[in-house]
Regions:
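Well-ordered beta-strand positions enriched in small/hydrophobic/aromatic, beta-favoring residues
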Residues: 86-88, 129, 168, 197
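A conserved short coil-to-beta-strand element within the FAD-binding core of flavoproteins
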Residues: 68-80, 113-128, 135
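Rossmann-like flavin
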Residues: 2-107
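Short acidic, glycine/serine/threonine-rich loops at helix termini
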Residues: 51-53, 127-128, 153-155
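Active-site substrate-recognition segment that forms the wall
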Residues: 18, 26-34, 121-123, 134-197
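Short, surface-exposed, polar/charged, turn-prone segments marking secondary-structure boundaries
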Residues: 60-61, 66-70, 94-97, 115-117, ...
């Protein structure tokens, strides 16, 4: 059963990526959606691992959007000598998360959803959620939280490990950013505690 489950998980992730792109286009959400992702290897073995993984994805899942990137090409695509090859995924990418969330909220409101900002859910109930100051009744409830669920959903909280995440924001870097990552891909590396930018 495991190969079938793995294939279904793969299909769900590719469907989710396509859905985000479709929603952005259909709802005209201005969120700087940009295709292209690089996973930059930093250990000598990462280049060979990337080749093997890209071949596995191609052979097992028919994935034609992910390919291995040799070390010399990776150094040209990320202006750093630190990386030794890796992967490129042309179907993945990045966007401005706040602008995307605002666009989704606008689209939901236009479709008739009622949004309840600053209404922290303290308990999920069969017909909605209880907040610190009232109740929200709903046929469907979507649990979309960070890793700190506490009593909101004990079963999910026991399966999620919160992690530290640090982000620095600057004013737009313009040409300086284009000189560092000419293709404007999003990048993460293969460290255990990874860097991403």
């Amino acid at each position: 059963i495991w190969p079938d489950a793995a294939r279904r998980i793969w299909e769900i992730t590719t469907e989710a990526t396509a859905l985000v792109k479709e929603i952005v286009a259909r709802r005209a959400i201005s969120c700087d959606l940009t295709e292209g992702y690089l996973e930059a290897g930093w250990r000598a073995r990462d280049e060979a691992d990337a080749r093997a993984y890209a071949a596995h994805l191609r052979d097992r899942y028919g994935c034609a959007t992910i390919r291995a990137v040799p070390a010399e090409e990776m150094r040209a695509r990320i202006a750093s000598p630190a990386y030794v090859g890796g992967l490129e995924d042309r179907a993945a990418g990045h966007l401005h998360p706040l602008n995307y969330a605002l666009g989704l909220a606008r689209a939901a409101a236009e479709a008739g959803a009622r949004l309840h900002e600053r209404s922290e859910a303290v308990a999920l109930e069969p017909d909605g959620a209880r907040t610190a100051r009232g109740r929200v009744r709903a046929e469907w409830t979507l649990l979309a939280c960070n890793g700190y669920l506490d009593d909101l959903d004990r079963a999910a909280a026991g399966r999620i490990m919160p992690i530290n995440n640090f982000i620095a924001a600057t004013e737009p870097l313009g040409e300086r950013a284009r000189a560092l990552i000419p293709g404007n891909e999003c990048v993460s590396d293969t460290r255990f505690v990874l860097d991403y930018f």
